[in-house]
Amino acid sequence: MGKIRAAVVGYGNIGKFTLEALEAASDFEVAGIVRRNGAENKPAELANYPVVKDIKELENVDVAILATPTRSVEKYAKEILALGINTVDSFDIHTQITDLRRSLGETAKAHNAVSIISAGWDPGSDSVVRALLQAIAPKGITYTNFGPGRSMGHSVAVRAIAGVKDALSMTIPVGTGIHRRMVYVLSLIHI
C-alpha cells in the first residue's frame, strides 16, 4: 500500500502544525494545501507544495484534514465528502457534535467516504484520556484543567464580531476543573 495523500485545508496555526505533523509521518504524503487566497502571497515554507483555492485542483487526495475555524467545518466537510474524499476535523462545539456526526455521516455514506469528527484535543484525545482514567478509577473525582494558554476557538469567535479588528482569548486555570477566560479585543472606532 502506498502513502496516504493528505490535503491540509486552511493554513492558520492549526494548518501549519498539521503540515509539520504530516512531514514527520512516514506513511503520509502532502497532496497540497488549500487556502482562501490560493498561491497568492504563498509563504516560503510552502514552496515545495501545490497551494490552491479549491481541493478539486489537487490530484489523488485520500483525506482532507480540516484546519479551519470550527464554525466552517460542516460546510467544508460536506463539499469535500461529496467528492468522495475522507475528512478529519477538530470540531470543538461540544453541544453540536451529535448534529455534526449525523450530518457528515449521511454525506460520507452517500459518497463512499469517511468523516472523522472532533479529533482534536478537547473533544478528542483529551476526552479519550479522561474516559480511560474514569474507567480505571470509576469512583474517583475527575477534573480537567486547561491552560494557561491561548483559546483559538474563542479568539476566532470574537474576531468574527463586526468592528473587532483582532482578539486574543486566554484560558487561565483556577484549579479543580475551573478556569477563567480573559479576552483582549482590538477594536477600531471611527470618530
Each predicted region: which residue ranges?
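NAD(P)-dependent dehydrogenases' Rossmann-like dinucleotide-binding region
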Residues: 121-122, 139-153, 165-172
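NAD(P)-binding Rossmann-fold cofactor-contacting core
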Residues: 25-44
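Anionic-ligand binding region
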Residues: 154-174, 180-184
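Oxidoreductase and adenylate-handling cofactor-binding alpha/beta cores
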Residues: 125-141, 156-167
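Beta-loop-alpha module in the N-terminal Rossmann-like domain of NAD(P)-dependent dehydrogenases
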Residues: 53, 60-82, 94-98
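Glycine-rich adenosine-cofactor-binding loop
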Residues: 5-18
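Rossmann-fold NAD(P)-binding glycine/threonine-rich loop
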Residues: 92-114
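Conserved small/polar residues in nucleotide/adenosyl-binding loops
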Residues: 189-191
